[in-house]
């Protein structure tokens, strides 16, 4: 996505842009700003024929990147000193892909040094961006890399992936300006099965998913099968003082199935085989595609158990009814029913534009209260075959994302919206305390 995000949107996105070539004809002085007329009338297509593997490959970065194999994992609870990549304002989730375009000599030099070592750097989760305050973060490992020169400027293009959560112990700045973070690697607490205390080990083997599991979620046969499976799995609850449904609230397998039902509502073509089977990896996959603000995301990042994380995610998915403009707060932009997936990563993924700004972009069928600015362009499109047009909040003018329109009539969907997470505020009903005062949303842990 090119950096033509509008004035305010460009200023709020972090890194200063590098020198750029002369503007193209698509960016002439006759820039349009019109109210979108067909955002509300858009309908879900019967089928999607777009290649969902294209966005995840980040082909706009180039196809001749040097790839690395293997992975670097640090011991749980160990203390490590890891360099911090400056200007990266993303709250990275383990397993999430992070594309980067780096122009600053300091960043280019740092990445070159990392390539010669373990290719790992720290991404800080800023709880207060203005004060540059961070107590948590995620290690990121480079798995693809390319150097090039454009207009006399050395640039580095990188694809990295989030690995492990950490707690920040200390941050020091070297003489060359690079920050070094002393961190403690946070472990994943694996909780035992809810029935392990009352169930014989020989009986637990019988509760593995049988091969006869129906594959169609909306099928009546699946619901019947699931009820029988749950009854058999938690039958030992009769030996305790608690009912079976209480145990199911803390059962990883049951929580994963409930979350999958929500994911299938977002993506009717979703195949269970494409999702991680490990509860830890699955919980991170879901966390990375939830359209929540940083306040909620850092709550997820702090949680050290997949079961607690899944419960929190399920609570968010059930409570979040719509998404509003973060600046206006009351201007509704879209609802959760309009979310769909156009990528193998899910409905939301991180992308980077030519000026190095990273946007975690959510795909939706319909959006409202938006104005379109500028002309459609296919340059640097994150979704090959689609042209993008800048979208701004109709009330405050805040940059919200882009409208994507197909360049060919046989493509489906013909149009959709890509909304940037940093501009969205999830609408979650606030609880009230005993005095009737509003409180922050309390997520189910």
Swiss-Prot record:
Residues 1-50 are annotated as: Disordered. Substrate recognition component of a DCX (DDB1-CUL4-X-box) E3 protein ligase complex that mediates the ubiquitination and subsequent proteasomal degradation of target proteins, such as MEIS2. Normal degradation of key regulatory proteins is required for normal limb outgrowth and expression of the fibroblast growth factor FGF8. Maintains presynaptic glutamate release and consequently cognitive functions, such as memory and learning, by negatively regulating large-conductance calcium-activated potassium (BK) channels in excitatory neurons. GO terms for biological process: proteasome-mediated ubiquitin-dependent protein catabolic process; protein ubiquitination. Pathway: Protein modification; protein ubiquitination. Component of a DCX (DDB1-CUL4-X-box) protein ligase complex. Interacts directly with DDB1. Keywords: Cytoplasm, Metal-binding, Nucleus, Ubl conjugation pathway, Zinc. This is Protein cereblon. Residues 320-428 form the CULT domain. GO terms for molecular function: metal ion binding. Its main location: cytoplasm. It comes from Gallus gallus. One of its GO terms (cellular component) is cytoplasm. It is found in: Cytoplasm; Nucleus. Residues 82-321 form the Lon N-terminal domain. PROSITE patterns: CULT, LON_N. Pfam families: LON_substr_bdg, Yippee-Mis18. Zn(2+) binds at residues 325, 328, 393, 396. Thalidomide is teratogenic in human, chicken and zebrafish, but not in mice. Binding of thalidomide and related drugs changes the substrate specificity of the human DCX (DDB1-CUL4-X-box) E3 protein ligase complex, leading to decreased degradation of endogenous target proteins and increased degradation of other proteins that are not normal substrates. This is probably the underlying cause of the teratogenic activity of thalidomide, possibly due to abnormal regulation of the BMP and FGF8 signaling pathways. Belongs to the CRBN family. (S)-thalidomide binds at residues 380, 382, 388. Residues 23-36 have a biased composition (Acidic residues).
């Amino acid at each position: 996505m090119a950096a033509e995000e509008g004035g305010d949107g460009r200023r709020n996105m972090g890194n200063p842009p590098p020198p750029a070539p002369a503007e193209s004809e698509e960016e002439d002085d006759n820039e349009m700003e019109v109210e979108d007329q067909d955002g509300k009338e858009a309908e879900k297509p019967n089928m999607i024929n777009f290649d969902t593997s294209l966005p995840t490959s980040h082909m706009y970065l180039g196809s001749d990147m040097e790839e690395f194999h293997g992975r670097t994992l640090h011991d749980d609870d160990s203390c490590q000193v890891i360099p911090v990549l400056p200007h990266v304002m993303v709250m990275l989730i383990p397993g999430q892909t992070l594309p980067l375009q780096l122009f600053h000599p300091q960043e280019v030099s740092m990445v070159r040094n990392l390539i010669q070592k373990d290719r790992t750097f720290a991404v800080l989760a800023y709880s207060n961006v203005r004060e540059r305050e961070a107590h948590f973060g995620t290690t990121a490992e480079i798995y693809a890399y390319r150097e090039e020169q454009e207009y006399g400027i050395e640039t580095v293009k990188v694809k990295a992936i989030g690995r492990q959560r950490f707690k920040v112990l200390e941050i020091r700045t070297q003489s060359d300006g690079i920050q070094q973070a002393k961190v403690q690697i946070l472990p994943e607490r694996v909780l035992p099965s809810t029935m392990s205390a009352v169930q014989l080990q020989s009986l637990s083997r019988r509760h593995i998913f049988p091969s006869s599991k129906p594959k169609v979620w909306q099928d009546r046969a699946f619901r019947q099968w699931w009820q029988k499976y749950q009854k058999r799995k938690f039958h030992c609850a009769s030996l305790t003082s608690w009912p079976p449904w209480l145990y199911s609230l803390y059962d990883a397998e049951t929580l994963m199935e409930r979350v999958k039902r929500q994911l299938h509502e977002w993506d009717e073509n979703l195949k269970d085989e494409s999702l991680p089977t490990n509860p830890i990896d699955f919980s991170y996959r879901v966390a990375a595609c939830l359209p929540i603000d940083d306040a909620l995301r850092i709550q997820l990042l702090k949680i050290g158990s997949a079961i607690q994380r899944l419960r929190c995610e399920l609570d968010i998915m059930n409570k979040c009814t719509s998404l509003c403009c973060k600046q206006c707060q009351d201007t509704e932009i879209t609802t959760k029913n309009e979310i769909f997936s156009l990528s193998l990563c899910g409905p939301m993924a991180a992308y980077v534009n030519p000026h190095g700004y990273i946007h975690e972009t959510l795909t939706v069928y319909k959006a409202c209260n938006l104005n379109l600015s500028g002309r459609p362009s296919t340059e640097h499109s994150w979704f090959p075959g689609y042209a993008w047009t800048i979208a701004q909040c109709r009330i405050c003018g805040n940059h919200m994302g882009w409208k994507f329109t197909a360049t060919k009539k046989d493509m489906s969907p013909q149009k959709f919206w890509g909304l940037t997470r940093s501009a969205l505020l999830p609408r979650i009903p606030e609880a009230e305390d005993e005095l009737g005062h509003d409180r922050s949303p309390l997520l189910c842990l």
